[in-house]
Design a protein with these regions (language model features):
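Sec-dependent N-terminal signal peptides
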Residues: 1-7
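C-terminal motif of bacterial Sec signal peptides marking the signal peptidase cleavage site
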Residues: 12-15
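Bacterial signal peptide processing site
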Residues: 17-19
Length: 192
């Protein structure tokens, strides 16, 4: 009985088999995660591509939908807007319609769960677009950048599709094949 009592006492003092180093590192890891979450990155209105890339590089390599939403980023997950994202998107569109300079970051996830960030700013009526695929393990291009003159919204076949384009007369059918076009890029496609 005395041996059992001593064993229980020893285990309780050692943190159930964890060393002091393990306990300290677990506390440090938890604090670091909380601190990272508290570091909200301001989405600035930019038109220079090197500045946009620098801004996007500030976001962590691994981002959950919750982390992304906390950062004020529009989250598209499973063909739907994430929590609070539709409100952010609608505010961006309102600013564009009101001819106010504005910017937004959109995050969509690959099949493997890797985040792809899209930065869009509207400055003096032009759209500056940078896609950041640096977090995509299987991505071939790390950054893609374009400038566009127009945005188009299509509501058809149960989908809400937003694109940036150089062609203001682009039809819905043509917009479905934007990957092959050099004059447009799809920002988001969500189920209505």
């Amino acid at each position: 009985i005395l041996g059992t009592a001593m064993l229980l006492t020893a285990v309780s003092f050692t943190g159930c088999g964890r060393s002091v180093k393990d306990s300290t590192s677990a506390k440090t890891e938890k604090t670091t995660k909380e601190t990272k979450r508290d570091e909200k990155i301001e989405i600035k209105i930019l038109s220079k591509y090197d500045q946009i890339k620098k801004l996007l590089s500030k976001y962590p390599k691994e981002m959950t939908a919750e982390d992304t939403s906390y950062q004020g980023i529009v989250v598209i997950e499973y063909d739907s807007f994430g929590k609070g994202s539709k409100k952010l998107w609608n505010q961006f569109l309102k600013n564009v319609k009101d001819h106010k300079d504005c910017a937004i970051v959109i995050c969509q996830y690959t099949v493997e769960g890797d985040p792809i960030l899209q930065y869009v700013s509207n400055v003096n009526g032009k759209f500056y677009y940078v896609e950041d695929s640096t977090r995509d393990a299987y991505g071939s291009e790390k950054y893609v950048q374009y400038t566009y003159d127009y945005y188009k919204i299509y509501k058809q076949d149960g989908h809400y599709t937003a694109i940036l384009t150089m062609d203001n007369k682009l039809t819905f059918d043509e917009a479905q094949d934007v990957r092959s076009l050099k004059t447009a890029i799809q920002l988001l496609d969500v189920k209505q």
